Curated annotation (Swiss-Prot):
Phylogenetic classification of the source organism: Eukaryota, Viridiplantae, Streptophyta, Embryophyta, Tracheophyta
Region described as Disordered: 1-39, 221-248
Species whose genome carries this gene: Arabidopsis thaliana (Mouse-ear cress)
Tissue note: Expressed in roots and flowers.
Protein name: LOB domain-containing protein 20
One Pfam family cited in the UniProt record for this chain: LOB
Biased composition (Low complexity): 23-39
Family the entry assigns: Belongs to the LOB domain-containing protein family.
GO BP annotations, alphabetical order: jasmonic acid mediated signaling pathway; regulation of defense response to fungus; response to jasmonic acid
Compositional bias per record (Basic and acidic residues), positions renumbered to this chain: 1-15
UniProt-listed InterPro entries: LOB (IPR004883), LOB_18/20 (IPR017394)
LOB domain boundaries: 50-152
Amino acid sequence: MADQQRGHNTSDSRRKSLAGKRTSQQTPTSSLSSGGVSMAAATTGTGTASPCGACKFLRRKCVSGCIFAPHFGSDQGAARFAAVHKVFGASNVSKLLHHIPVNRRHDAVVTISYEAQARLSDPVYGCVSTILALQQQVASLQAELSVVQSQLINSRVAMANVMQQQTHHQQQQQQLVVMQQPEYSNNSSASTTLAGAAMNSFTMTADAAAVSYDVMAPTNLEHSLQPMPPHQQRRGDYQHEDEEESGADFSVAVGSTAVASKVIFPAEDFHRR
């Protein structure tokens, strides 16, 4: 009887051990299945199949409401976030973005990324080197602009001086023309007056000469040889006085003619001298 009881106990213990082994084999599979469900829930909670670039670089799970997800995509966000994390640190950037309004965070991330890239390329000046280069370029452009403006002002002043000289020269020419016109008219009137006086005196002298020629005719000469009555002698004296006056007029006419010729033709007299 005792042997039967011992065999029954050993069989029960074997059954219990097998049952324990089975349960131990089933628990890992159940834990794996529950972990897969939780991972699926996590992925569905973020709404994206892959984590953002920041979480991918940090090798952490991208939870819902990740502050880096809207600004660092999954494609190139990891490289951008690497520079930001190396220069500023992920925790500092996260704190900075939390203190900035949502509508201004994108601009902040762009500037932070640019500053990080500039700091990595130029550890001494960083983005200040770009600012200095732009300032130097602005200064050089302002200097060129000032030179061009001064040249433009000088050209305008020169053009104004040329125009003023031209107008002054034209005014002088007009004044000379106006001043020469009255002189020419006065000279012409004076010359015509002198010429007319000379012609009148010349005609008078010619008439007197004709009269004297008639007196010297042969017929008149015979009568002149005869004694003349006293009244005719008086007439002869009067004629002699008239002839002397006509001779004086002729000399005056000749002198006036010479003066008129000098006035009308001054160049000839000048050449003769």
